[in-house]
Structures are given as structure tokens and as C-alpha cells.
Amino acid sequence: CVVEDVTDEILETKALKVERDRDGLTGVGNRLAYEHMLQHKNSHPEEIPGSGFLMCDLNDLKGVNDRFGHDKGDEYIRRSADIIREAFPGAPLFRIGGDEFVVQLDGLGQEQVTRGILAMERAVKAYSDGNVFAAGIAAGYAFFDPGKDVSLGSTLARADTYMYRKKHKMKH
């Protein structure tokens, strides 16, 4: 009988998976991790009820990059990720695009989400007050509703619509 210790290989594989699923700038889940989460949920339909998502979009990241440089833009992205993470502690957070984030709201109630959004707004205001530009995070959320949604895709589309409505209100 030959026994081989594969502990190091297992740990290395786990470390590579964590690295593969993390956004290098913010440390939150990346688009690949987000897509894996959605694939998992779609292949386990019993997990879909109760699913919810908060879509977040940073206001004027391109303008910040153009006017103040990419270092300042990167700081804006990192600080925004921290703000979102602090407003929704323990909730999975993903950066799915340059200025787009998604929070998985499973297990949270309407009141918790509202409190999280308010905390986010206060933190963004404090960040803006001490900065050379006006930071902003537009956010919209939706929970899976069997009366409205045929899939998680339609739940995400509703959250995205609410986020763009908020973004429009913030600009006007």
C-alpha cells in the first residue's frame, strides 16, 4: 500500500481557484465568479426563490480617469468596492465590469437592503466631501418574483432597470 500526501497540491489548487475568482484591483469576486454563481443557481432551481441582486454602477468613472488619471480612477473603484462591502457585510460581492458591481442579496430582507443602500449613500457622500470629484454609486435591486420573472435573468434585468433609473435621477 502506497500513501502519498497530496495536501500541498490540494492547497495550491484551492489557492489558484481563489485567485482565479478574485478581481485583482478590489479583491471582490470577479465576473467569472459571478457567472459561476449564476450557473450554480440555474442548475439548482430550488435555490432561485429568495434570490436577489443589487446592481451598482459608479458615476462618471471615465470622467475621473480623464481628468485626474487612472490612479485616481482605480482609487475610486477600490473605495467604492469597500463602501459596498461595508454596507452589505457578508453578502457576496462581484465586480462584473470596469465600473459595475453586483451584490448577491440572498437571505436579506427588504429592510436590510434599504439600510444597506442608505449606508452606502452616506459613505459615498463622505468620500465625495473629501475628494476632488463628486463620487456616486447608482444602485437598483430586485428579488426573484415568480409572478414577474421567468428566470434569474429577468430578475437581474429588473435590478439593472432600477439602477439605471436611479442613475438618471442622480444626473438630473
Residue spans of the language-model regions?
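Short beta-strand-to-loop capping motifs
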Residues: 103-108, 143-145
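PAS-family sensory domains
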Residues: 1-5, 158
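Conserved long alpha-helical elements within nucleotide-processing catalytic cores of c-di-GMP signaling
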Residues: 17-21, 29-52, 59-86, 94-98, ...
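Catalytic-core segments of nucleotide cyclases and related cyclic-nucleotide turnover enzymes
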Residues: 9, 70, 114-121, 125, ...
